[in-house]
Curated annotation (Swiss-Prot):
Pfam families: PIG-X (PF08320). Belongs to the PIGX family. Its main location: endoplasmic reticulum. It is found in: Endoplasmic reticulum membrane. It comes from the Eukaryota. This is Protein PBN1.
Length: 416
């Protein structure tokens, strides 16, 4: 089986290509620098698969949220996410009309990747971002990484692989359209030698526009003091309503937090939203909940969350810090099919599949928020138990003294 392997390197300026690249008959080496991004894409054909469902697996390290994304990258949700439209719902997945989903902070790729994937990949979840699509006829694995100052990356064709490399710089771009230029190199299948590299250019419209490429961003924070009912504050006072656009907030909440749909009125809410059950009684049922809220421009928006009772611990501290990563997005219908022609973006499962194909997503903020939740300590169990029994005993004695003491006094009163 032939694997198609595409490598893309993006530099800041045209002169960087010549200064940071060298080659011979079989190998090409690129050198890193400030803001240099390396993308690898593997495309594997599937034959004889009986599974007709689609699955998307994404991973983005939380530290990556603070990094300025390039125009060949897509804004993914932080953490590990799996989306599937299979009729068989796996354990702990939540469902909506379009897909089933799972979200976690743990990179657990081997559990969800099909067994036929054997590329000897060196997974690096601490530094790399992954976007994987599993379809009935093919599997696509996309890996993003920074190529840092002084770091080198050498590319050469391996057996049964069709290799193509593009080395680009950003020629021009605005908030939606991108024009990149550079060179494209191919390797011959028979002897593994490089063909002559050709000049090339690409013009496309971005599906996801990173917040660092937007002219305006919004502040996103938790109202202080946080308490048991934390309030997310989204400041859109400097924004105006746009035609065919919606300001949205996308939330993936762990079990320790939940939305009261009768109080907050989300646009969409899937997963665990029970108002009474503690966190530990839901662990085997679902990972949490996913929701989308519509926000109003020109004002301060507020979304109230609620905390669940969590399982007591043994000397692990009196509070559990729960983290989540809200995404504030401006979703717009463009009426333009250029989005589908973007060579670095393919619309897949996830919240974007709930919108039309011509929708672009302008990311205004994505911030990690922390909620401290009080946690009982089992070492205090005896103290609490004995204290409760003592209070109960005193209460019983007091009640009996009042009832029987008053009756005795009344009987001892002498009537004239």
């Amino acid at each position: 089986m032939v694997t198609r392997h595409r490598v893309t390197v993006l530099y800041n300026a045209p002169e960087d290509i010549g200064n940071h690249m060298r080659q011979n008959d079989t190998h090409l080496t690129v050198r890193g620098g400030s803001g240099v991004v390396l993308q690898q894409r593997w495309l594997l054909e599937r034959t004889g698969s009986l599974d007709k469902s689609f699955t998307r697996i994404t991973w983005r390290p939380r530290a990556d949220l603070a990094r300025s994304l390039s125009v060949i990258e897509n804004e993914l949700s932080a953490g590990f996410s799996v989306y599937s439209n299979s009729s068989d719902v796996p354990e702990r997945f939540i469902t909506n009309p379009v897909y089933n989903s799972f979200h976690s902070e743990k990179f657990d790729i081997e559990q969800y990747l099909p067994p036929e994937v054997d590329l000897n990949l060196s997974w690096n979840p601490e530094d790399f971002t992954y976007d994987i699509s599993v379809e009935p006829t093919q599997i696509q694995i996309v890996e993003y990484r920074l190529l840092k100052q002084g770091e080198e990356f050498t590319i050469a064709r391996v057996k049964d692989e069709k290799l193509e490399v593009g080395v680009f710089f950003v020629d021009a771009s605005d908030e939606s359209d991108v024009d990149i230029g550079g060179i494209r190199c191919n390797w011959r299948m028979d002897d593994g030698k490089m063909e002559r590299c050709q000049k090339t250019s690409l013009l496309y419209k971005q599906g996801h526009i990173a917040y660092n490429h937007s002219t305006t961003t919004t502040s996103l924070y938790l109202n202080e003091p946080i308490g048991l009912h934390p309030k997310i504050m989204i400041d859109l006072t400097d924004f105006e309503e746009r035609p065919k656009c919606m300001y949205l907030m996308h939330l993936q909440l762990p079990l320790e937090l939940f939305i009261d749909k009768f109080q907050s009125s989300p646009l969409l809410l899937f997963g665990e939203d029970d108002l009474e059950l503690p966190e530990y009684s839901l662990r085997d049922k679902a990972w949490g909940s996913e929701s989308i809220f519509e926000l109003k421009a020109g004002t301060m928006n507020e979304v109230t969350l609620h905390t669940r009772y969590i399982e007591p611990s043994n000397n692990k501290g009196d509070k559990l810090e729960v983290s989540f990563d809200p995404e504030v997005i401006l979703a717009c219908d463009t009426g333009d099919n250029k989005v589908s022609r973007n060579p670095f973006y393919k619309k897949g499962l996830g919240y974007e599949s709930l919108f039309t194909d011509d929708t672009t997503f302008r990311h205004l903020n994505s911030t990690t928020l922390l909620v401290p939740i009080p946690r009982p300590d089992t070492k205090d169990y005896s103290k609490i138990k004995n204290g409760t029994l003592l209070c109960l005993l005193i209460s019983i004695i007091y009640i009996f003294s009042k009832v029987f003491g008053n009756n005795k006094k009344k009987r001892s009163v002498k009537r004239e």
